[in-house]
Amino acid sequence: MKRPDYRTLQALDAVIRERGFERAAQKLCITQSAVSQRIKQLENLFGQPLLVRTVPPRPTEQGQRLLALLHQVELLEEEWLGNDNSSDGPLLLSLAVNADSLATWLLPALKPVLADSPLRLNLQVEDESRTQERLRRGEVVGAVSLQPQPLPSCLVDRLGALDYLFCASPAFAARYFPNGVTRSSLLKAPAVAFDHLDDMHQAFLQQNFELPPGSVPCHIVNSSEAFVQLALQGTTCCMLPHLQVERELRKGVLIDLTPGMVQRRMLYWHRFAPESRLMRRVTDALISHGRDVLRQD
């Protein structure tokens, strides 16, 4: 059986996390040549490349499996040995989460874990349709995702759904939708997306108004909180989590432009198996809080 040296695995992990050999060498306090040599040793052991030498480098499928193994072993080892504060500081917990969860329910869910556990949280923000891929690549040990099916050697639980409403300010509605939201009026109404892969707004318009992708003018803004601000100041209409704008809707500073047309996104919690005690606490906290604030029907 091929048993990797965890020192070489840590070099592979550093190259991926630091997005290059030079910064990985600085992180590990060794030379860049030593980093390359350790990865070469690992590749020789497994008889195949473990890195794709792009900019930034990315792991091959075998590299992803090895990184997942490393992260799982690190969690289990630290807890089994009781090293709450190792020489590298508190344990690093890397999770992939979507921006809307981060802006609404996720941090309150993690509050008891952060209060009781000495750890460093590394939240990697990604669209919920792509967070699972970060888990597959071994970049994180847990992910909030749209995908209901677990990856091999992983566990999954349903968290609940975020309901999205098509919102804008009253002034925006009066300007762009004086006669209500129609197919023709939507063509002139500025929208906003998180990035060029964010298709929620387009999917909503296509499903309910038969507008093809790319039909409406759309800003790109990488911030869930900025979506709300843009809507409040009358700049755009956009899909917003009901959980995020309940107060604004009650006050009337935002309005639901299409009552009854709800875009529901069910969220799932993925993580490696077996779970460490820390990950079990994270799982319990997310599921418990999700039951309180996310839609369960």
UniProtKB/Swiss-Prot annotation:
Keywords: DNA-binding, Transcription, Transcription regulation. GO terms for molecular function: DNA binding; DNA-binding transcription factor activity. Residues 4-60 form the HTH lysR-type domain. Residues 21-40 bind DNA. Pfam families: HTH_1 (PF00126), LysR_substrate (PF03466). InterPro entries: ArgP, ArgP_gammaproteobact, LTTR, LysR_subst-bd, Tscrpt_reg_HTH_LysR, WH-like_DNA-bd_sf, WH_DNA-bd_sf. Controls the transcription of genes involved in arginine and lysine metabolism. Homodimer. Belongs to the LysR transcriptional regulatory family. This is HTH-type transcriptional regulator ArgP. It comes from Edwardsiella ictaluri (strain 93-146). The gene is argP.
